[in-house]
């Protein structure tokens, strides 16, 4: 199984890079994990609605190029479905049973995701109503993916 994490913007903070790197190492026992960082568009301070739509559209084009035709896509969006870690684990396990070999997670830029990406997604997922920095969300999501595999294995990691 392959797990891809497509992110808009570059990860800058060293502590986040270190945390993600640790979970990438741990995940290598279960899957091929790949994090793809895409260039984000600069948003002007007083951007209009049209400016924001154009920015999201440009980012969506970059994202779309990295999604495989047969990928099971989970896009992170505030309006997405929320569920506990156990259900998330079942979801990941179930994707392979449905014949998918790649799960692709998408974290958008500071403006969120364009509707074209949300429509392409097989599922929209939310970690709640809190707003988290997109770079921190990468670490949280990577840990949850690892936790999902550990739950499937019956590991005491998840208590």
From Swiss-Prot:
Belongs to the RNA methyltransferase RlmH family. It is found in: Cytoplasm. It catalyses: pseudouridine(1915) in 23S rRNA + S-adenosyl-L-methionine = N(3)-methylpseudouridine(1915) in 23S rRNA + S-adenosyl-L-homocysteine + H(+). Specifically methylates the pseudouridine at position 1915 (m3Psi1915) in 23S rRNA. GO terms for cellular component: cytoplasm. Homodimer. CDD domains: RlmH-like (cd18081). Pfam families: SPOUT_MTase. One of its GO terms (molecular function) is rRNA (pseudouridine-N3-)-methyltransferase activity. PANTHER family: METHYLTRANSFERASE, RIBOSOMAL RNA LARGE SUBUNIT METHYLTRANSFERASE H. This is Ribosomal RNA large subunit methyltransferase H. Its EC number is 2.1.1.177. It is an enzyme of class 2 (transferase). It comes from Streptococcus pyogenes serotype M1. Keywords: Cytoplasm, Methyltransferase, rRNA processing, S-adenosyl-L-methionine, Transferase. S-adenosyl-L-methionine binds at residues 76, 108, 127-132. Its main location: cytoplasm. InterPro entries: Alpha/beta_knot_MTases (IPR029028), RlmH-like (IPR003742), tRNA_m1G_MTases_N (IPR029026).
